[in-house]
Amino acid sequence: MIVIVGAGISGLAAAYTLSRRGEHALVIERGEPFAEQSVGLARIFRIAHQRPELCRLALHAREGWRRWESEFGAGRLLGSEGFISAGAVDAVAAAMREAGAEFRRLDRGEIAAHLPFVDVPWETGIFDPLGGSLRIRRALTALAQRADIRRADVLSVADDGAVALGDGTQLRAERVLICAGVQTPALFGPLDIEFGSHTRFTYQGADATGAACLSAPEGYGLPIGSTGRWAFGQDVADPATVRRLFPTLTPVGQVDCVTARAPWLDAGGDGWALRRRGRVTGFVGANLMKFGPVLGELLADFVLDAG
């Protein structure tokens, strides 16, 4: 038996991939599935990254999202809105070019055409036509329905695969994968990462359906599926900037999100770390949702490799 600690995108994707390979994976979750780093409805998929290897992985992940759409039968999981990186974009353009990914440069007017409710301050940007808004609830619900999930607190995980639960149960696993977000360092050991929080607000007042997803120096934004609403997040909330960017929008909700900081993340905050001790694998990262299908494959490969 393989025990997976954490029912976010990483744990559920790994469990699904392992089950398709004939392995029994038991997912242990202390709360509700997809409730911490995977919380909320709004996630951006993008090919655009600052490292060509991440652009290539995103191209592979896009194929995986389309495959999941076919396998789950839950409707569209990856939207076709496109993605705009605004502001200083030379590093992103260079990485996409090296990866062979399609993109085109935009001027201020072209950015405004994709985001008609934004008072555009950026003179340049790039458009990633393969980017879009992920339908997170559909995807994670479909993964959870296909997983064996047990609600429990994990107290400790030993090198030999012994897992101690809060109710006194002791599990013996051939392999253990810990991908429990903020809880991972406490269960696995130091992974050179710090977790914090930021708030993502939801807005209405203009129909954002079909608008491109956005990453800019001021924050990130995306349409929430077909609801017509727009989500926008910042590392540090700056209401004045938001009012200037979106003068016709009104906040109607918020989601408190987990953010990560680590020296091994790139300048865009993307990346992950994977470590092993004995039979136990520890995994942490940031901006992981878009890579979901690829992470499932990567984590399954790593867990099953005894080397």
Q: What are these regions, as identified by a protein language model?
A:
Residues 42-114, 122-123, 218-220:
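Dinucleotide-binding Rossmann-like beta1-alpha1 core, especially the glycine-rich loop
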Residues 126-161, 165-167, 171-175, 179:
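Helical element adjacent to the flavin cofactor pocket in flavoenzyme catalytic cores
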Residues 19-38:
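Glycine-rich FAD pyrophosphate-binding loop
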Residues 107-108, 150-153, 253-256:
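Short loop/edge segments at beta-strand edges and connector loops
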Residues 1-10:
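Beta1/beta-strand and adjacent pyrophosphate-binding region of the FAD-binding site
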Residues 10, 33, 183:
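Conserved Rossmann-like nucleotide-cofactor binding loop
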Residues 248-307:
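C-terminal catalytic lobe of FAD-dependent flavoproteins
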Residues 46, 63, 172-241, 245-252:
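Flavin-dependent oxidoreductases
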